[in-house]
Amino acid sequence: MAGILADDSRPAEHVVADLAMGGQALGKFANRLPALVPPWNRIAPHLVRFLPEIGIRGLSTIGARTREVPIRGLRQNNVHIDVIDWRGKRTGTARGFLGSDFIINEVVSHLHARRTGGADAGEATGLMTHHADMDDAMFEFVTELVNRTRAHPAVVWQRASEVFSCS
């Protein structure tokens, strides 16, 4: 399937056909979740309206969502924090780990914004991971974050089917 970027200049029907074909291929697997995480977590806004027509019920991009349900039949929940410094602007190393302190501060900032009206309180705080690009330190951080927060009574880790109401 060709990349579907925010600046994809192909006709919408070609992009939607690629998405539908990909969805059909994924449909051959058990427990398929009808949700889309587009390449680089970006999709051209004019394509979103076609997603429910091809069976996609959930969408995740990067940054704050504008609406929980951008179009009838589609629920959106985005990621807000990336573990990788892709261009090396913060760490000095392209594709480097942003570090535990930085990521925890970002998580706390997003949670604070949710509680004080600065972010959509109904949108789960999303952490973006990249299994193919992560090193041991990144995997260890994510594992420790999940394990430590899972034990806290105020934390609820949700399944993707819950986040996108596809259960």
Residue ranges and their predicted role:
Residues 58-59, 117-167:
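C-terminal domain-boundary segment and adjacent tail
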Residues 18-19, 100-110, 139-145:
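Well-ordered, non-membrane alpha-helical segments in soluble/globular domains
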Residues 38-118:
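Active-site-adjacent pocket scaffolds in enzyme catalytic domains
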Residues 25, 29, 50-54, 144-152:
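Alpha-helical structural signal in soluble globular domains
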Residues 1-49, 68-70, 81-90, 127:
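Metal-dependent polysaccharide deacetylase catalytic core of the NodB/CE4 family, i.e.
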Residues 21-28, 109-117, 148:
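A generic secondary-structure signal
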Residues 4, 11, 15, 96-103, ...:
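Residue-level preference for long, well-ordered alpha-helices that form the structural scaffold
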